[in-house]
Design a protein with these regions (language model features):
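Acidic, proline/glycine-enriched N-terminal capping motif
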Residues: 1-134, 288-296, 302-317
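Basic, nucleic-acid-binding surfaces and adjacent catalytic neighborhoods in DNA/RNA-processing proteins
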Residues: 22-40, 53, 79, 166-317
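Phosphate/anion-contacting hairpin/loop surfaces
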Residues: 69-202, 210-213, 217, 222
Length: 317
């Protein structure tokens, strides 16, 4: 699922292409995509884009008269840009593995929304004003104070990161595991499965440690790791994208430290990266750096193996 760094780079690429441009036509090709009936989606046609912002993991397109188109890509939704007119584009997806859900025809080109796989989770809402946006807001604190600040060095800065006191207050407002707290949209905005793994690796903290059991030093470490990890990945993705459009958005990157790196060596200590699987998600961590050599129980396998489930890295052989 695209998270804060991915959405940030999407927004910057969109700003260069559609800010101030007219949305001529919205073409919805999936009956499952649009989740609102009023205002009608046709009401944004003929209007110019006057704002772009992130709301959690959603991308918000602002138009005149305070109309907002809000896209949630979920796990497999992706955006694509073609500098072509709508007359020259087909409504068919170019890949049998991706379904085309919608086309947004601007006077400068066409933005398409696709979703891989068979499940249709991506969504589109059209809402009115800040009240409409608030209805989609899960309530998590924004980690960076400004979403569209002054540009610095040709790139928009992310703004000031949340201070340690505020971060700690939100983090410890409920007694959750660190993994759950970082990915809870009611607590923090924009962090998901991938970057939470990277943050916890940088902080050298166990994903199952409880938030209210953290020492002041551990909280400060997590605060710094969250800031540094998100900034680092925004900068990496900016460098990868350049002036183009982000077409390689993925949660699994070869230069990540732990996420998606099961059984590969930790880049810091060399210990094999391990995983905890639950439902459709997987948490990756380094036992050597994060859990003092202890293997965390994988719910499915530990039930199957019972006493044979290894407890430490050494028992893996």
């Amino acid at each position: 699922m695209p998270e804060l760094p991915d959405i940030t780079v999407y927004l910057e690429a969109l700003e260069r292409r559609i800010w101030g441009h007219e949305l001529e036509k919205v073409q919805i090709t999936s009956p499952f995509l649009l989740r609102t009936a009023t205002p009608p989606v046709s009401s944004v046609e003929g209007r110019k884009v006057s704002n772009l912002r992130r709301l959690g993991k959603r991308i918000c397109f602002g138009f005149e008269d305070e109309l907002w188109l809000v896209i949630h890509l979920m796990i497999a939704g992706r955006l694509h840009w073609k500098a072509e007119t709508r007359k020259s584009l087909s409504t068919r997806s170019s890949s049998k593995f991706k379904a085309q859900l919608a086309l947004f025809h601007f006077d400068a080109g066409t933005l398409s929304l696709t979703e891989a796989g068979t499940q249709r989770r991506a969504s589109l809402h059209l809402v009115q004003g800040e009240a409409g946006l608030s209805s989609l807001d899960r309530g998590g604190v924004e980690l960076f104070t400004r979403q569209k600040p002054e540009r610095k060095g040709g790139q928009p800065a992310l703004g000031e990161f949340i201070d340690l006191t505020s971060f700690s207050r939100v983090l410890q407002s409920e007694n959750h595991t660190l993994k759950r707290a970082l990915t809870d949209p009611r607590l923090f905005s924009g962090i998901g499965n991938a970057y939470s793994d990277e943050i916890l690796w940088h902080a050298q903290l166990s994903p199952v440690k409880l938030t209210q059991k953290l020492s002041d030093e551990e909280t400060a470490r997590l605060h710094a790791a969250t800031r540094d990890t998100l900034i680092e990945w925004v900068e990496r993705l900016r460098a990868e994208t350049g002036e183009g459009f982000p077409e390689k958005v993925t949660a699994f990157r070869t230069d990540m430290a732990t996420h998606g790196r099961y059984k590969e060596p930790c880049p810091r200590c060399g210990t094999s990266v391990q995983r905890i699987r639950y439902a459709a998600n997987e948490t990756n961590y380094c036992p050597g750096c994060q859990t003092a050599g202890k293997l965390l129980a994988d719910r499915a396998l530990s039930r199957l193996l019972r006493e044979d489930w290894p407890k430490t890295v050494e028992e893996l052989g």
